[in-house]
């Protein structure tokens, strides 16, 4: 029996690539240059499944162009806002993501952003690299400690809970809001206080972490009203999705001192981010590295393979996103 064919749009960790090649005829696109949507659709004519990344924006107009032989789209990411699930359902295309491998890695980056923002690490690092450090001074780069401060977590799924676990080690008070309340045992484990509204959570959050998925309901929720509800001088971090944030208003709040600091790993329109962030000293910015740990990326790649294996192996597909 001939092997099924799959297109992998970016190079994956070698172990995952080797696994895919054992089971399928693999067409693997390199990362230089990046694959275009037109190239992906053209190649899709000769394969049975696509293994994509968040760089390939599969909106409805793209899904409508994908040939009928495509049975599955598996994405090498926890997020799936780059795929129009309704369009895939209408076409009978199964969709899966990699939800588990990134949890700890992303929570670690969120914790790093909290620490780096609170202690003004980016400013200090820049001072060293630009050879502008004048030497120790009593009031230079004075930041905030984390202990006994309230961390508000918006989105208490696996990453939000993993962040709570790490913040406990810094003696932070954990508060959260989610549309689905955690179990009483989880709340006890993380010593987490549930708020029944976002406004209630915001009002006590000296530190505020965005850990919600990008949906029509959450998109650009972090806006003027949200910022106004936070305590004066709050610190906000985002490891979720860039389009949760209204960047113009965040930049203005940072310039005015309404927000003390922002630590962001994700941005709307990345890699082209809002110009206002570049010159602000009170930002601690990373280039979307939340899952960039060796084991996490390997786990993600294997999970992306799992969905394709399940489809072609006739396994239960009830867990698929579409």
Curated annotation (Swiss-Prot):
Keywords: NAD, Oxidoreductase. Active on hydroxypyruvate and glyoxylate. Pfam families: 2-Hacid_dh (PF00389), 2-Hacid_dh_C (PF02826). Belongs to the D-isomer specific 2-hydroxyacid dehydrogenase family. It is an enzyme of class 1 (oxidoreductase). Pathway: One-carbon metabolism; formaldehyde assimilation via serine pathway. InterPro entries: D-isomer_2-hydroxyacid_DH, D-isomer_2_OHA_DH_cat_dom, D-isomer_DH_CS, D-isomer_DH_CS1, D-isomer_DH_NAD-bd, NAD(P)-bd_dom_sf. NAD(+) binds at residues 158-159, 178, 239-241, 265, 288-291. PANTHER family: 2-HYDROXYACID DEHYDROGENASE YGL185C-RELATED, 2-HYDROXYACID DEHYDROGENASE-RELATED. Its EC number is 1.1.1.29. Optimum pH is 6.8. PROSITE patterns: D_2_HYDROXYACID_DH_1 (PS00065), D_2_HYDROXYACID_DH_2 (PS00670), D_2_HYDROXYACID_DH_3 (PS00671). The active site is at 241, 270, 288 (proton donor). Optimum temperature is 45 degrees Celsius. Induction: By methanol. It catalyses: (R)-glycerate + NAD(+) = 3-hydroxypyruvate + NADH + H(+). GO terms for molecular function: glyoxylate reductase (NADPH) activity; hydroxypyruvate reductase (NADH) activity; NAD binding. This is Glycerate dehydrogenase. It comes from Hyphomicrobium methylovorum. Homodimer. GO terms for cellular component: cytosol.
